[in-house]
Amino acid sequence: MGRMFGTDGVRGIANKELTADLAYKLGKAGAFILTEGTHRSKILVGMDTRISGDMLESALVAGILSVGAEAICVGVIPTPAIAYLTRKYNADAGVVISASHNPVEYNGIKFFNKNGYKLSDELEDSIQALIRDDFKDVPVLTGENIGRKIEEDGEAIRDYIDFAKSTIKGDLKGLKVALDCANGASYITSVEAFKELGAEVHVINNKPDGININRNSGSTHPEDLMEYVVKNNCHMGLAFDGDADRCLAIDEKGNLINGDFILAICGKELKKQGRLKKNTIVVTVMSNLGLDIAMKKEEINTIKTKVGDRYVLEEMLKNDYAIGGEQSGHIIFSDYNTTGDGLVTALQLAHIVKESGKTFSELCSIMKELPQVLVNAKVPNDQKDIYLKDEEIKSEIDTITKNLDGSGRVLIRPSGTEPLVRVMLEGENQKEIDKLAHGLAKLIENKVK
C-alpha cells in the first residue's frame, strides 16, 4: 500500500478510488487515533456541494460512530469554517469531505486536529497503519457504547459568518462587490457576510446542484467574473474555489489579481497597523519576483517555502508570522484562522479597498509582475537531480542568473508526480527569458539521453 494521504488529505475519483468502504475505514481509524482514551469524543463533519458528498458522509460517519465517537454533521460549509468551529466547539477533531478546486467526479477527506490544524504526516501515517492492519487491537463496541450522529441545524454557518465579519473593523457600505461562489461551499456564507456588512452584493455561480461545482466558475475559471465586474461597474470581484479555502480577486478594470498581489496589499496594510509580526510575509518559491521587489520598497521581508500551503503554515507557526500564502489565493492570516480562508481574505481585501479611498487597480500598482516562463524538461525519475550535479547545467544556470542581474531568476523544480523537471525563468524581457528557458530545458533533456 503506497501512501494514502497526499498534501491535502485523501483524494480520488468518488466511488472508484475514494469508495464508501474507504470512507468508512478513514472515519473509524481517524476517530480512534484522534480521540484515543478521551471522554466520549466529538467530531465535526462538513462537506462541499458535490453529489458524492452524501454517500461519503454516510460511510465516514458510520466509521466514526463504530468506535464510540459522536459525529456532529454540519452539512455544506467551507473548509476553513470546520477548522475554526472545531476550536470554537471544543471538538476533538474536524473532517471535511471535499476535493477543493478539482472537478466534480473527485472528492476528498481531510482531517483537522482539535486545534484546527491539518494533521502531521506522523498522524496520517498512524491512521493509514491502522487501516492496513485491519484495525488490530481496536475493540468492537456494542449497545450504549456506539456513538450518536447529531444533525446540526444551521448554527454552525451562523457562527462562521459572525466570526468572519468580526475580522474587520467597521463595515463595507458603499462598496459594490461581485462574488463568484463556484457553485461550492461558500454559496451562503460569503454572500451573507458581505450583505450583512452593508456591501452592494452581486453574485454569480451560487446555485449548486451537486454536479456544477467549479464548472467554468470560481477561482480556477474567473473569466465570467472578470467580464461581469466590468459590465456591472463593480468596485471589485472575488472568486472562491469549491471549498472556499482560497480567493482570487478582480479589479474594477476586469484584471485578475492573484495571491501575490493580495499578499502585497494586505502585508503593507498590516505593517501600517503595526500588526505585521517581524515585518515579514511568508510566500512560496513560485511567488513572482515582482512581489520581492515590491516588498523590499516597503521594507518588508519575504521568506520562501516549498510549494504548498502546509509548508507556508509550518513556517508561520515556527516563527509566529502574521500572514503568508500562495499565488493560487491560499492566504493564511494567523491572527484569525489556522488554514487558508477565502472569506476572511476577501473581507480583508474589500475593507482595505473601502478604507483607502483608492480604486482597487490603484492599490494593485504596489507591485509589477515580472514576465514568467515555465518549460517542462522530460527527465527520468531517477535523474531528476541532474541539474544539481552536472557541471555544464550548473554553469549555465549561474550565467543566466548573473545576466539577469537581480531583476530576474532561474528556478528548477522536479515534478513530484511525473518524469519532468520544471524550468521557470522570470525577468523583464519576455522574449529573452522565453529563449533562455527553452535553451536550459533542452540542455537538461540532452544530458539524460
From Swiss-Prot:
Activated by phosphorylation. It catalyses: alpha-D-glucosamine 1-phosphate = D-glucosamine 6-phosphate. This is Phosphoglucosamine mutase. The lineage of its organism: Bacteria, Bacillati, Bacillota, Clostridia, Eubacteriales. HAMAP family: GlmM_B. GO terms for cellular component: cytosol. NCBIfam families: glmM (TIGR01455), PRK10887.1 (NF008139). It comes from Clostridium botulinum (strain Hall / ATCC 3502 / NCTC 13319 / Type A). CDD domains: GlmM (cd05802). Its EC number is 5.4.2.10. It comes from the Bacteria. Its cofactor is Mg(2+). Binds 1 Mg(2+) ion per subunit.
